[in-house]
């Protein structure tokens, strides 16, 4: 029996800086988790003035793989993680917002779902890191 997908709208904001080589596998892993568990979601990729073709790699991935919306923000000057994530949050419309501060899943992608379950328990902020724990 297939489990019903969650109806909450999810926004996933990812910071990118010269990540052309790894952005496609990263987005594929995140999208696989979101697609498995959520009926509706959006991706927001914030390109922090990359010089290696990161923005084009995101566009190529979206054209070939996505059925859900993707917003690509391109910073004309390098802003750093915090300001870029704030810009991505400003665009997010989700009931829940995931923030990825690098295009690198250094933990089991299943923790994306576990973080959501933990948030539903009433936690305003849930953090996942490379120790494979949800706090």
Whereabouts are the PLM-identified features?
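N-proximal low-complexity "stem/linker" segments adjacent to membrane-targeting elements
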Residues: 1-32
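Acidic helix N-cap motif at the loop->helix transition within catalytic regions
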Residues: 22-24, 52-61
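Short beta-strand/loop segment that forms part of the nucleotide-sugar
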Residues: 39-49, 73-74
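A conserved acidic beta->alpha catalytic loop
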Residues: 47-56, 104-105
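Glycine-rich, basic loop-to-helix element that forms the pyrophosphate-binding segment
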Residues: 75-92, 110-114
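Acidic metal-phosphate-binding loop of nucleotide-sugar-dependent transferases
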Residues: 79, 103-106
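Conserved donor NDP-sugar-binding/catalytic core segment of glycosyltransferases
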Residues: 112-132
């Amino acid at each position: 029996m297939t489990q019903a997908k969650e109806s909450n709208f999810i926004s996933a904001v990812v910071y990118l800086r010269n990540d052309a080589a790894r952005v496609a596998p990263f987005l594929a892993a995140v999208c696989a988790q979101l697609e498995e568990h959520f009926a509706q979601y959006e991706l927001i990729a914030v390109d922090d003035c990359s010089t290696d073709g990161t923005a084009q790699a995101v566009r190529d991935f979206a054209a070939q793989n996505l059925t859900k919306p993707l917003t690509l923000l391109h910073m004309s000057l390098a802003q750093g993680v915090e300001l870029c994530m704030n810009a991505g949050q400003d665009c997010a419309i989700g009931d829940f917002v995931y923030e990825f501060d690098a295009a690198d899943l250094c933990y089991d992608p299943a923790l994306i779902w576990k973080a959501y379950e933990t948030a539903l328990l009433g936690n305003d902020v849930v953090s996942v890191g490379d120790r494979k724990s949800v706090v």
